[in-house]
Amino acid sequence: MASGPEDPILERYFKGHKAAITSADFSPNCKQIATASWDTFLMLWSLKPHARAYRYVGHKDVVTSLQFSPQGNLLASASRDKTVRLWVLDRKGKSSEFKAHTAPVRSVDFSADGQFLVTASEDKSIKVWSMYRQRFLYSLYRHTHWVRCAKFSPDGRLIVSCSEDKTIKIWDTTSKQCVNNFSDSVGFANFVDFSPNGTCIASAGSDHAVRIWDIRMNRLLQHYQVHSCGVNCLSFHPSGNSLVTASSDGTVKILDLVEGRLIYTLQGHTGPVFTVSFSKDGELFTSGGADAQVLVWRTSFNQVHYRDPSKRNLKRLHLEASPHLLDIYPRTPHGHEDKRETIEINPKLEVMDLHSSSPPVVDVLSFDSTTVTDSTCRAVPGKGEDICRYFLNPLLMPECSSTIMKKKPEDVGDPPSENQRSVPLAVADALEHIMEQLNILTQSVSIVEQRLSLTEDKLKDCLENQQKLFSVIQQKS
């Protein structure tokens, strides 16, 4: 694959988090970016000019991972507070809280059909949840140290996980057994993911290396030694032909997987880079790190007519003869010092629209409509429908901020000045949240009254039946 006709360019950058950014993901429609941070908040950024950002408040410790549901109407997040949350992305702050892990949760990932969620934790376990039923399903135990990441395969039949025990494991979701194991004596993988076609996995190593494994042949295909510090995250381009990586050396690198070489080194962050993610259409990718900035990069990869890497092995692509290790290069670690293009970026100089870098932020305070645990295996206190109905009908939840804004006309365009607002925005949001809580309280009281009435009716029936029984006994005696 040749490099694209144009170099990657920095298109936008956002500031709003108060600490390092740990995870980022594009919405399926590519109109929003969600980010997680050490500041315990999630933020939702719109790629529309002058649109407001939303800060979701609910976790009590560092948010370690997040991901949009495939329908785009929900957002899952994991935290060091040992919980997983499932958010409805509106201004009401509805969320389900999943409690099952006994240690910080490091990773969340939806299956491609959105039916399941997999979580990985420092308690050495992997847990799978049903989104339809809002309940815990099962755990996977084989790792002997903290599990840092777990991902579904594109077809949902497999799960890949990596741990500080220096192993990468492949799990069958049907048998719930470990069916494959990759080990490395040098370091452990911080992050792992499937290629878009599901035949390979890529790992981001603490030993500074990026590795590509063929899970059909159980062999290492490519080994890139291009970073000078640990690799924290990676993301496949939707075509599967390239890979973007984030490292503690402060750089973002783009690898050509067909030719097996490094094509770009991007230097835009000050400090370690912790997360990177391609958009679903492959036109953008975002990065975040210790500098608390979200950088949005535009690529021209979609303009290039890629060759499918697997077509190099067409003669071997059948069950009797899978692709051979020697068919794919490089076969040994390469420093890739030659033909490397380094692009240094200063966000404040490269992005002219500085006003959009720090958009107005609306705080969304969470209230828990559902709590799900592995012990109850069901939602309590019985309001799973609050979140589940959004899962069943994505049309109930807007997929992008532009449709959210339709409910609030004042949210469109520039934020109104203080003399144009009779009530400050923060106060209005707080009042709206209080009203929502009062509505919930009213509904709860109504439900309690109904249950009391039902109990009284049942008690009355019991007394009548008891009286009849006594009458029958007296007649017989």
UniProtKB/Swiss-Prot annotation:
Keyword annotations from UniProtKB, A to Z: Cell projection, Coiled coil, Cytoplasm, Cytoskeleton, Phosphoprotein, Repeat, WD repeat
GO BP, sorted A to Z: acrosome assembly; cell morphogenesis; cell population proliferation; centriole replication; cilium assembly; homeostasis of number of cells; positive regulation of centriole elongation; retina homeostasis
InterPro entries attached to this UniProt entry: G-protein_beta_WD-40_rep, WD40/YVTN_repeat-like_dom_sf, WD40_repeat_CS, WD40_repeat_dom_sf, WD40_rpt, WDR55_POC1
Disulfide bonds: none
Post-translational modification: Phosphorylated in mitotic cells that may be mediated by CDK1.
Ranges: WD repeats: 16-55, 58-97, 100-139, 142-181, 183-223, 226-265, 268-307
GO-annotated cellular components: centriole; centrosome; ciliary basal body; cytoplasm; spindle pole
Gene3D superfamilies the record matches: YVTN repeat-like/Quinoprotein amine dehydrogenase (2.130.10.10)
Stretches of the chain forming a coiled coil according to its record: 449-469
Keyword Coiled coil included in the entry's annotation: yes
Compartments it resides in: Cytoplasm, Cytoskeleton, Microtubule organizing center, Centrosome, Centriole; Cytoplasm, Cytoskeleton, Cilium basal body; Cytoplasm, Cytoskeleton, Spindle pole
Primary localisation category: cytoplasm
Family, per entry: Belongs to the WD repeat POC1 family.
Oligomer and partners: Interacts with POC1A. Interacts with FAM161A. Interacts with CEP44; the interaction is direct and recruits POC1B to centriolar microtubules. Forms a microtubule-associated complex with POC5, CETN2 and FAM161A. Interacts with CCDC15.
Annotated function: Plays an important role in centriole assembly and/or stability and ciliogenesis. Involved in early steps of centriole duplication, as well as in the later steps of centriole length control. Acts in concert with POC1A to ensure centriole integrity and proper mitotic spindle formation. Required for primary cilia formation, ciliary length and also cell proliferation. Required for retinal integrity. Acts as a positive regulator of centriole elongation.
Protein name per Swiss-Prot or TrEMBL: POC1 centriolar protein homolog B
